Amino acid sequence: MESIGIFFGSDTGNTENVAKLIHKYIGTNISSIHDIANTNKKDIELFNILIFGVSTWYYGELQCDWDDFLPTLKKINFNNKIIALFGCGDQEDYSEYFCDGIGILYNVIRLSKNVRFIGSWTSKGYSFECSKALDKNKNFLGLVIDEDRQPEQSNQRIIQWTKKIKTELNSLLN
């Protein structure tokens, strides 16, 4: 399998911790992990398979490092790349903006031709009002983690999601 680049932005450490677990479960021999705060366009362009992790802040805003990186992200050509997304949010205190960061990244990346997204995730088991991270079938566009309200479910969700994206990758690449 090709090398996978995992890029995250984190203020509190939650998204970074999730990224580290994804790195572990995907396989440290086939993936590398990068803080978006220390990333440039060329770093991302090195990979054909990318996993982006973002948290949502305040009223549906991107984590600050992703917000700073957004102009660069818009310049990247994601043609023929495979993308998986994950995000952290608080479904109780920010129920009307739950994990919007995933949707914001998705809406930038999807503009490239032939980009393929993998790793959609069920919205069952979460309680929120609204999210830009939902697809037309009401599934999340990627893995959603709530370390504030459901920390006991995070590890199992990460394990299940990494198995899912490995299966999807094997199907696409073989």
From Swiss-Prot:
Any GO molecular function: electron transfer activity
InterPro entries: Flavodoxin (IPR050619), Flavodoxin/NO_synth (IPR008254), Flavodoxin_CS (IPR001226), Flavodoxin_lc (IPR010086), Flavoprotein-like_sf (IPR029039)
One Pfam family in the UniProt entry: Flavodoxin_1
Annotated ranges, domain Flavodoxin-like: 4-166
Domain of life: Bacteria
SUPFAM superfamilies in the cross-refs: Flavoproteins
Cofactor names: FMN
Keywords: Electron transport, Flavoprotein, FMN, Transport
General function of this protein: Low-potential electron donor to a number of redox enzymes.
Family according to the record: Belongs to the flavodoxin family.
Protein name: Flavodoxin
Organism the protein comes from: Buchnera aphidicola subsp. Baizongia pistaciae (strain Bp)
Organismal lineage: Bacteria, Pseudomonadati, Pseudomonadota, Gammaproteobacteria, Enterobacterales
Protein encoded by which gene: fldA
